[in-house]
């Protein structure tokens, strides 16, 4: 018997005559090609009965069998069967729609807290609703859309309404036959499933089979909600799967669906919050975005008037206009909480409106008001005990990453059925099918934070519940974003005024324990020996502002001497300025400012809220406040900052002396401005380069026009300029600009110059060589890698090396010098007047032919200590010549780089001899070389030799066999002075060249 998935098809096939069935089978040989599917062998088709043919089709063409048979019915002139099949399909689709309508009407009524008429809700989300229709109605191809916004802005409510409207026949009717709605966080305890099982769990009886439903993926929409609270990592994976029937780990199924590996023809509508956007968005293909903007001031008033009767609503709306709570009420969930809180207050016949500057104060008012309405006359001790059970449930769920609770979870945490009924009435909890959830995930975070204020030493320890230091570590050092809201409440509840709100219902709650735990954690984090570093400082600053406790804020920020901040919005700039202006200990600040912060593009009128307009208006003030601390810093790193002209002018003003801040008060020693899109007209240089302690200036990746370069050079020539390290890599500096720079450095204090990754060409180097020949030039290091140089540049450098007495490091890496160019350099190095100590020549297209000259230099030059020849084709012959030179008693070389060079393991004997005879060699880089085991044995014998003085060997141990890795580990154990490292010089070379990566918070 064909499985239930093919029962409907079998009934239709049985209506075919034998002749029609034979013709049907013959046509089936060709039909798969129309659907771009692999054909079934004719032998299998020919020998099939009607029953076995259905099984065959469902096995080979899951999800396509129904459509294929509809087409074949028409071809055998049985249009009646095709019509009958389509009617069956429509009937079952209608059943599903009716079932979903009933389900989501219940959810909308019982679980969705709009508390206003539907017509009023549609007016509030009119823009987003139109966007949803346009996105899906205008496209016939699969679409992925995101509903984005901050927590509590109504994303889930919007999606529930969309689902209800589709099921009611008023939305996307011509686009989708099936719409499935899943809250993905409810899968947190499901380790394995198939997409077919997930879909089946939502289907009523007598629905189409999953095979039939998925036969036309273009008519299917998946609405996925709750990614902020999903515990699974959905990062890009190589083991994705296209089989929707196969049971797989939950994260593989979800990731395969999101990345369109599984059911690529379906459409997706996803709810993504601030936590999930950076984790999920990059997995999606060309997503369209619908942004929930929150309530405008007008919408808040409209909501209040809809929530209450007209007269009371007007009174509430008028009061809100002058209430600090208004900016919080732009969040729809908080607006609902505010109105609910007032309703309870009015029911108790209490006068006045509560005020709240922070989320913690807001939620505390809501929670206390709910308790007063139910337990007004209960002793505070009883209320505290009741509250503690709810808080324990919340915090246990947070640590387990659990947001959907069963009856056992409630019972284990001391919540009885009668307690549950009270929490449901208070709207702290709500039902979720047969399970229970908090009324909003943010409410769970609030009660979880409250747990730490109710906790006592005598309490029984629950192993799964972490300590405050563990919680803070997850938030600020390990980047676990699901804890951020809890952290905001934890800091907010520290406030004495917020604690006072709790006292009437719950007695005296002392926040000092939590405060001390927080301070202790950051004290440890700020110590150098701590393995963890602060990663989310902007979140910390937001939490500190929510505490509203000046002394506490100062105590925390003064524990941190170095901070990295990613400023992505005006609000982040605001909290950063608030926190850092209170620091007296900060020495190093690494700052990244995104383009949107200083953008002059405003939102459309319908998106404007009082909050958003205020933020834009105050951005300049926040920036000025932050700039005010720069004079006290020792290191300022402006990495990939996107400024407008006004912001640059404010930066310039902050670095200028005033009557209250004289020039001598500025402590800045190091300034980096890498990858800045706009450096202004260059007038900033005059201000910066007069700072009395500024010794280091790095502009890597920041384009400098000719005019800006000239202003930089003018500032360098000023006698007040004390810059010693000037790093101008990747600044678009031409040969002509290089000439101007060279002239400005003749009488300057600059000792280290990096011009890497600029098209200087030979003409530019000629100008630099003229500078080097001037007796007034004090330059000691010159970095010229990737500067489009040829052997001709080496002719100019030959003369400069002979006349300059200060230059000790010359980097010519990754230039087309060839053997001819290096031979010219060797002639200079053989001269006793040449004082160069380090020569970097990696990737210069060298062969073994230049190694004879280099070897001669190693023998006769007593000054050269470092020679880097990596990534050159010097072959075995070249390595042997170098090893002979190293073995010479006159050789003084200390560091030799042969990483990525072309040579074989046969050279290991020569290297071993050099290691045991050269008394000065302490660093040998063979990184990226995978020597065979026999060669490695020879090398390791030399490393264990008592005459070997090597301290660093560059090798990637992980690239070798287990046997070879064990050999290298044994060498390190026996020789305590030796370190075998991968990328041994990477950081040092990067620092010397001044190169930076494009912004990353971990850079």
From Swiss-Prot:
Superkingdom of origin: Eukaryota
LRR repeat placement: 749-770, 778-799, 806-826, 835-856, 863-883, 892-913, 920-940
UniProt entry tagged with the keyword Ubl conjugation: no
GO terms for MF: ATP binding
Domain NACHT: 143-465
Keyword DNA repair attached: no
Tissue: Predominantly expressed in the intestine, including proximal and distal colon, cecum, ileum, jejunum and duodenum (at protein level). In the ileum, expressed in epithelial cells. Also expressed in oocytes at all follicular stages and in preimplantation embryos (at protein level). Although expression decreases in preimplantation embryos, it is still detectable in blastocyts.
GO CC term (a single one): canonical inflammasome complex
Subcellular location as annotated: Cytoplasm; Inflammasome
Segments forming domain Pyrin: 1-91
Assembly and binders: Sensor component of NLRP9 inflammasomes. Inflammasomes are supramolecular complexes that assemble in the cytosol in response to pathogens, such as rotavirus, but not encephalomyocarditis virus (EMCV), and play critical roles in innate immunity and inflammation. The core of NLRP9 inflammasomes consists of a signal sensor component (NLRP9), an adapter (ASC/PYCARD), which recruits an effector pro-inflammatory caspase (CASP1). Within the complex, NLRP9 and PYCARD interact via their respective DAPIN/pyrin domains.
Function according to Swiss-Prot or TrEMBL: As the sensor component of the NLRP9 inflammasome, plays a crucial role in innate immunity and inflammation. In response to pathogens, including rotavirus, initiates the formation of the inflammasome polymeric complex, made of NLRP9, PYCARD and CASP1. Recruitment of proCASP1 to the inflammasome promotes its activation and CASP1-catalyzed IL1B and IL18 maturation and release in the extracellular milieu. The active cytokines stimulate inflammatory responses. Inflammasomes can also induce pyroptosis, an inflammatory form of programmed cell death.
Name assigned to this protein: NACHT, LRR and PYD domains-containing protein 9B
Origin species: Mus musculus
């Amino acid at each position: 018997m064909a499985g239930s998935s093919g029962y409907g098809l079998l009934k239709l096939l049985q209506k075919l005559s034998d002749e029609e069935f034979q013709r049907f089978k013959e046509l089936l040989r060709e039909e798969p090609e129309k659907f771009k599917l692999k054909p079934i062998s004719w032998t299998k088709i020919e020998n099939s009965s009607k029953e076995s043919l259905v099984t065959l089709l469902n096995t080979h063409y899951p999800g396509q069998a129904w459509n294929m048979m509809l087409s074949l019915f028409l071809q055998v002139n049985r249009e009646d069967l095709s019509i009958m099949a389509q009617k069956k399909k429509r009937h079952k689709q209608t059943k599903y729609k009716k079932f979903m309508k009933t389900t989501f009407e219940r959810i909308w009524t019982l679980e969705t807290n709009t508390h206003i008429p539907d017509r009023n809700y549609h007016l509030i989300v009119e823009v987003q609703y139109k966007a949803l229709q346009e996105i899906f109605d205008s496209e016939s191809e699969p679409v992925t859309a995101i509903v984005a916004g901050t927590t509590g802005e109504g994303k889930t409510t919007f999606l529930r309404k969309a689902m209800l409207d589709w099921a009611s026949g008023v939305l996307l009717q011509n686009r989708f036959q099936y719409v499935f709605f899943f809250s993905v966080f409810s899968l947190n305890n499901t380790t394995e499933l198939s997409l077919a099982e997930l879909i089946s769990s939502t289907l009523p009886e007598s629905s189409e089979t999953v095979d039939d439903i998925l036969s036309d993926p273009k008519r299917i929409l998946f609405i996925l909600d709750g990614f902020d609270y999903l515990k699974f990592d959905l990062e890009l994976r190589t083991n994705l799967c296209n089989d929707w029937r196969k049971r797989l780990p939950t994260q593989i199924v979800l990731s395969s669906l999101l990345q369109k590996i599984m059911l690529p023809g379906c459409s997706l509508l996803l709810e993504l919050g601030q936590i999930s956007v950076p984790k999920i968005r990059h997995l999606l293909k060309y997503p369209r975005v619908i942004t929930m903007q929150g309530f405008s001031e007008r919408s808040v008033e409209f909501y209040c008037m809809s929530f209450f009767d007209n007269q009371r609503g007007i009174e509430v709306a008028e009061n809100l206009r002058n209430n600090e709570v208004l900016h919080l009420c732009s969040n729809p969930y908080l607006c609902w909480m505010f109105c609910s809180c007032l309703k309870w207050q009015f029911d108790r016949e209490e006068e006045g409106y509560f005020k709240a500057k922070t989320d913690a104060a807001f939620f505390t008012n809501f929670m206390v008001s709910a308790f007063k309405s139910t337990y007004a006359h209960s002793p505070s001790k009883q209320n505290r005990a009741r509250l503690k059970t709810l808080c324990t449930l919340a915090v246990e769920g947070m640590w387990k990453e659990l947001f959907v609770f069963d009856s056992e979870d409630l019972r284990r945490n001391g919540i009885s059925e009668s307690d549950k009924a009270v929490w449901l009435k208070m709207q702290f909890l709500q039902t979720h099918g047969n399970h229970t959830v908090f009324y909003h995930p943010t409410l769970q975070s609030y009660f979880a934070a409250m747990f730490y204020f109710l906790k006592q030493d005598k309490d029984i320890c629950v192993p799964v519940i972490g300590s405050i230091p563990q919680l803070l570590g997850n938030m600020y050092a390990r980047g676990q974003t699901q804890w951020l809201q809890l952290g905001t409440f934890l800091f907010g509840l520290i406030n004495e005024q917020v604690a006072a709100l709790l006292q009437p219902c719950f007695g005296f709650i002392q926040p000092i324990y939590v405060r001390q735990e927080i301070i202790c954690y950051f004290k440890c984090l700020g110590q150098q020996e701590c393995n963890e570093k602060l990663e989310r400082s902007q979140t910390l600053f937001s939490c500190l502002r929510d505490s509203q406790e000046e002394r506490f804020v100062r105590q925390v920020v003064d524990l941190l001497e170095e901070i990295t901040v990613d400023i992505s919005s005006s609000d982040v700039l605001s909290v950063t300025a608030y926190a850092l202006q209170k620091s007296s200990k900060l020495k190093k600040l690494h700052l990244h400012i995104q383009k949107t912060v200083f953008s002059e593009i405003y939102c459309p009128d319908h998106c404007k809220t009082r909050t958003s307009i205020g933020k834009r208006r105050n951005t300049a003030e926040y920036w000025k406040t932050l700039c005010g601390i720069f004079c006290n810093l020792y290191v300022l790193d402006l990495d990939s900052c996107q400024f407008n002209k006004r912001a640059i002018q404010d930066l310039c003003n902050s670095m200028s002396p005033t009557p209250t801040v004289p020039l001598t008060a500025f402590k800045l020693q190091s300034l980096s401005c890498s990858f800045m899109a706009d450096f202004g007209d260059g007038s900033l240089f005059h201000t910066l380069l007069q700072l009395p302690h500024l010794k280091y200036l790095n502009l890597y990746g920041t384009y400098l026009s000719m005019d800006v370069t000239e202003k930089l050079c003018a500032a360098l020539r000023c006698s007040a300029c004390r810059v010693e390290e000037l790093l101008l890599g990747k600044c678009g500096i031409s040969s002509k600009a290089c000439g101007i720079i060279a002239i400005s450095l003749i009488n300057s204090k600059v000792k280290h110059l990096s011009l890497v990754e600029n098209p200087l060409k030979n003409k530019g180097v000629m100008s630099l060589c003229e500078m080097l020949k001037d007796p007034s030039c004090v330059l000691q290091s010159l970095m010229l890698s990737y500067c489009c140089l040829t052997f001709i540049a080496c002719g100019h450098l030959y003369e400069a090396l002979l006349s300059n007495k200060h230059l000790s490091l010359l980097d010519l890496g990754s230039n087309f010098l060839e053997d001819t160019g290096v031979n010219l350099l060797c002639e200079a190095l053989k001269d006793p007047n040449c004082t160069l100590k380090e020569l970097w020549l990696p990737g210069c297209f060298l062969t073994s032919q230049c190694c004879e000259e280099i070897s001669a230099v190693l023998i006769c030059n007593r000054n050269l200590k470092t020679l880097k020849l990596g990534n050159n084709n010097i072959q075995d012959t070249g390595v042997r010549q170098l090893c002979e030179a190293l073995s010479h008693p006159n050789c003084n070389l200390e560091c030799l780089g042969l990483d990525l060079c072309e040579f074989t393991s046969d050279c290991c004997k020569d290297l071993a001899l050099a290691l045991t005879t050269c008394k000065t060699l302490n660093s040998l880089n063979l990184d990226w070389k995978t020597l065979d085991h026999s060669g490695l044995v020879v090398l390791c014998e030399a490393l264990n030799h008592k005459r070997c003085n090597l301290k660093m060997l560059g090798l990637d141990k992980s690239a070798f066999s287990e046997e070879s890795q064990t050999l290298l580990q044994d060498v390190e154990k026996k020789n305590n002075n030796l370190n075998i490292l991968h990328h041994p010089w990477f950081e040092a070379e990067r620092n010397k060249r001044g190169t930076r990566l494009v912004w990353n918070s971990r850079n």
